[in-house]
Regions:
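Intrinsic-disorder/low-complexity detector
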Residues: 1-121
Length: 121
């Protein structure tokens, strides 16, 4: 039985969440955390999801209308943060990093990767 007033995440995010359903006040934080984990996972595979692809993940899911834009934004911010953190973590080979960075930033990936590393200190 599904608890009233709770919401599930898209399948791609749900596998990175601590449980299946969330109350409205928990949803944004859960989406940000799951987005970070998804970004990390995608970076390791050198796959980058566009904003449109991430919005598409939510199609057919019931979200509270007053929260939907913030949920999508928090998911995206988490995803971008997780992707960047994976690139600068030191846990990937240089080849993996260059492939993932190019997937994320295109031709200017070297410059943007350098900036990401500088931001991280």
């Amino acid at each position: 039985m599904v608890a009233r007033g709770t919401y599930s995440l898209p399948e791609e995010l749900a596998r990175h969440a601590p449980r299946e359903r969330f109350a409205p006040d928990e949803l944004r934080g859960a989406c940000r955390e799951a987005g970070e984990a998804l970004g990390w996972e995608d970076a390791r595979k050198a796959t980058f999801r566009t904003a449109a692809q991430m919005v598409e993940m939510w199609r057919r899911l019931d979200l509270p209308a007053w929260e939907a834009p913030y949920i999508l934004r928090d998911t995206r911010l988490g995803y971008l943060n997780g992707y960047e953190r994976a690139l600068i973590s030191g846990e990937m080979s240089e080849e993996q990093i260059s492939n993932a960075a190019e997937s994320r930033w295109g031709q200017r990936w070297r410059e943007r990767l350098r900036a990401a590393r500088e931001r991280s200190g």
